[in-house]
Amino acid sequence: MWAFPELPLPLPLLVNLIGSLLGFVATVTLIPAFRSHFIAARLCGQDLNKLSQQQIPESQGVISGAVFLIILFCFIPFPFLNCFVEEQCKAFPHHEFVALIGALLAICCMIFLGFADDVLNLRWRHKLLLPTAASLPLLMVYFTNFGNTTIVVPKPFRWILGLHLDLGILYYVYMGLLAVFCTNAINILAGINGLEAGQSLVISASIIVFNLVELEGDYRDDHIFSLYFMIPFFFTTLGLLYHNWYPSRVFVGDTFCYFAGMTFAVVGILGHFSKTMLLFFMPQVFNFLYSLPQLFHIIPCPRHRMPRLNAKTGKLEMSYSKFKTKNLSFLGTFILKVAENLRLVTVHQGESEDGAFTECNNMTLINLLLKVFGPIHERNLTLLLLLLQVLSSAATFSIRYQLVRLFYDV
């Protein structure tokens, strides 16, 4: 399908890159231009980790998301240019066109639902339902275009399951859960300037490198498809990060977290590298597992779990969840004890007028790093977390191209 003139890059990718660079300029320009509009609409808030009471525009992910969509809407004809010349195209590749449109529909739905969350401040149960609904077009595209639900079984399990295993509907459940996880994973690992956009930028850069390496492989078309989305996403996110970096002049909002997560889910599923995609999310997976006791309210969870600012030192310190000891269930007590023994949490107990109370640090990767390294300046904490994301990507490439031999025949 992708038979284009010999260029350093295929023509559609070159057009995509040029459009993405224009998208970077547009994002950098539009965000300050719309600042007053968001503040007038009361889509603004204060940075809780700053002494300043200045109002900062929120939900700016809707701007980078809109620029991203405009780039790709204008780009739609270019992968199919050969079909405009009759002798170069025997039949129009409808399945590839459907994949492109279906992917854009899923991302567009997620941007809309994310913005609705920012405006309406939805509950957590809704945050799980929204990505599920937005992923349905994606699953239908996979069903109509591919429909393959058979996986290659890793070597250690082949003596039980055989070489191949057809998961059937469970494979679609897995893809739906992947979309839900990706959209919420970035949202959970958030709360300091530049972190949401920064981690997304590192992940997208890692995927771009992975796609470029795989262009010489057997699945060239899938990785070109992924690049069509990742290159514009990288540059629009870079424009957003320019304004969101410490000290942040804008907040990205849940809109960006959902937009980023669904974009990653789209390329992972339709690009057929969902396992590699999950490896790029190692810090987010750890943060999710570490946060589970609070997310399921086994251990009391405050509305905001971001670290707190020490006004005297100007550094961030761990934030805590304080609750009555008698209100903690047996399971919560057990989890807290195990986590304390593993030095994953700091627990304080004491007495107050209301009786015995327990206090533990909020269970996020951000607070865990503050527990390990002590109080850190916000900018340095963001850099530390992004360094961890880069190391995670390096580990992913090592697993994907070296350790994979232990599990699969490559």
Swiss-Prot record:
Gene knockout outcome: Mice die 4 to 5 days post-fertilization, just after implantation, suggesting that protein function and N-glycosylation are essential in early embryogenesis.
Gene Ontology cellular-component terms listed: endoplasmic reticulum membrane; Golgi apparatus
Superkingdom of this protein's organism: Eukaryota
Pfam families, alphabetized: DPAGT1_ins, Glycos_transf_4
Key words, A-Z: Endoplasmic reticulum, Glycoprotein, Glycosyltransferase, Magnesium, Membrane, Metal-binding, Transferase, Transmembrane, Transmembrane helix
An annotated GO BP: dolichol-linked oligosaccharide biosynthetic process
Principal EC category: transferase
Protein activity control: Inhibited by natural nucleoside antibiotic tunicamycin, which acts as a structural analog and competitor of UDP-GlcNAc.
Compartments reported by the entry: Endoplasmic reticulum membrane
Record: residues binding dolichyl phosphate: 127, 180-188
Glycan-linked positions: 148
Residues at which Mg(2+) binds: 187, 254
Cofactor(s) required, per the database record: Mg(2+)
Coiled-coil spans in chain: none
Reaction equation(s) it catalyzes: a di-trans,poly-cis-dolichyl phosphate + UDP-N-acetyl-alpha-D-glucosamine = an N-acetyl-alpha-D-glucosaminyl-diphospho-di-trans,poly-cis-dolichol + UMP
Membrane topology value: Multi-pass membrane protein
Record-listed E.C. numbers: 2.7.8.15
Binding site for UDP-N-acetyl-alpha-D-glucosamine: 46-48, 58, 193, 303-305
Gene Ontology MF terms in the entry: glycosyltransferase activity; metal ion binding; UDP-N-acetylglucosamine-dolichyl-phosphate N-acetylglucosaminephosphotransferase activity; UDP-N-acetylglucosamine-lysosomal-enzyme N-acetylglucosaminephosphotransferase activity
Protein's pathway: Protein modification; protein glycosylation
Residue ranges annotated as Lumenal topological domain: 1-10, 81-93, 146-168, 216-220, 272-273, 403-410
Task performed by this protein: UDP-N-acetylglucosamine--dolichyl-phosphate N-acetylglucosaminephosphotransferase that operates in the biosynthetic pathway of dolichol-linked oligosaccharides, the glycan precursors employed in protein asparagine (N)-glycosylation. The assembly of dolichol-linked oligosaccharides begins on the cytosolic side of the endoplasmic reticulum membrane and finishes in its lumen. The sequential addition of sugars to dolichol pyrophosphate produces dolichol-linked oligosaccharides containing fourteen sugars, including two GlcNAcs, nine mannoses and three glucoses.
SUBUNIT field: Homodimer.
Name listed for the protein in its UniProt record: UDP-N-acetylglucosamine--dolichyl-phosphate N-acetylglucosaminephosphotransferase
Species the sequence originates in: Mus musculus
